[in-house]
Regions:
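Short juxta-domain linker segments that transition from a proline/glycine-rich
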Residues: 1-333
């Protein structure tokens, strides 16, 4: 689907899908792009399906990489025939599909495989190169690498996104790395080991440079690269890694930085040292930090599911009243 769309607008790669390509892609799917100053804060884009207009923030209100991904994700919903989600599982599934579509649109498979193949020949595969060549976010580049590298090059891989405290937002693997999980196997909100690259990157002398590290674990030794994304102000860690055996194909595999993790053994990093327990148990009373960012996109209405969780629909409808499009509002007062 993305290949046909890109060919239709004249993109033949390799390299960045241009702004003109994106505008033409929107038209190919039957939409016009409109950049506005007053998009509601709770929405990344608003689509008027009656007038076939997709509203996105002005360039000065969002980074160009962010704006490109928002356009591509929005087009993905329509290209894939998504309907209003009926429950939260449906909503999440549609988001995942639209995000994958966006990655495939902005970093086309054939072009990405060409870049990765050339880099593999030099032992220099890097997420950063995809980030720069295709002008996409580091996280999207990391997802695209992990989408394609096992299928095309038989290299096992894992991906993590975590916050400065090590709490996982997203993670998946096919290389056997031991991801933390609760009794039900849920990984979101679990804390990664203190000695993993995703945590150690924040402790390094230059925490905003790429952090390369080998970590010995109960499942084997893994090489990882961690990048700290500062967009949004919190500074989340995006980590990609593979087994020690396959690290030779990646830039940064020559690092001498090594650590050992004994997790899930609680004595590794989850339990405080016995001496500290003896000194302070019973007299320490911390107040937990609010981790509201984990639930900011979740539905807050306990009575009924909202098809667009986290979005203030009053603001959305007010916005559309201000931007009625050429056909005007569907039901004028």
């Amino acid at each position: 689907l993305t290949g046909a769309a890109l060919a239709a607008v004249g993109y033949h790669g390799p390299g960045t899908v241009s702004e003109r390509n994106l505008t033409d892609l929107a038209a190919w799917f039957g939409f016009t792009l409109a950049r506005v100053q007053d998009l509601p804060a709770s929405a990344r884009s608003i689509s008027d399906t009656r007038n076939r207009i997709i509203y996105v923030p002005q360039r000065n209100n969002a980074s160009n990489r962010t704006a490109r991904s928002v356009i591509a994700q929005t087009l993905g919903h329509f290209a894939l025939g998504h309907h209003d989600p009926v429950d939260f599982e449906d909503y999440v599934g549609q988001r995942v599909e639209a995000n994958y579509f966006a990655g495939a649109l902005l970093a086309p498979e054939k072009a990405v495989v060409s870049v990765l193949g050339d880099a593999k020949d030099r032992g220099d595969i890097s997420v950063e190169d995809l980030n720069e060549v295709f002008y996409i976010s580091y996280e999207m580049a990391a997802h695209r690498l992990t989408n394609l590298i096992t299928r095309h090059f038989d290299i096992p891989i894992h991906f993590q996104r975590s916050d400065p405290e090590g709490l996982l937002w997203k993670a998946y693997e096919n290389d056997g790395v031991l991801l933390p999980g609760d009794a039900d196997g849920t990984i979101e909100g679990q804390r990664v080991c203190r000695w993993w690259s995703a945590r150690q990157a924040f402790e390094s002398e230059d925490s905003y440079s790429l952090h390369y590290q080998y970590t010995s674990t109960a499942a084997g030794t893994y090489w990882c690269v961690t990048h700290i994304e500062v967009e949004g102000g919190r500074g989340d860690a995006v980590t990609v890694g593979t087994t020690e055996e396959h690290a030779r194909w990646f830039r940064g595999s020559g690092t001498t930085r090594r650590a050992t993790s004994r997790c899930p053994d609680p004595t590794c990093c989850r339990q405080p040292p016995p001496a500290a327990v003896r000194r302070w148990e019973g007299v320490a009373w911390p107040s937990a930090r609010d981790h509201s960012h984990f639930v900011s996109g979740l539905p807050t209405d306990t009575v009924a599911f909202s098809a667009f969780p986290g979005v203030d629909m009053t603001d959305v409808y007010s916005f559309l009243d201000r931007h009625p499009g050429p056909s005007g509002p569907p039901h004028p007062d």
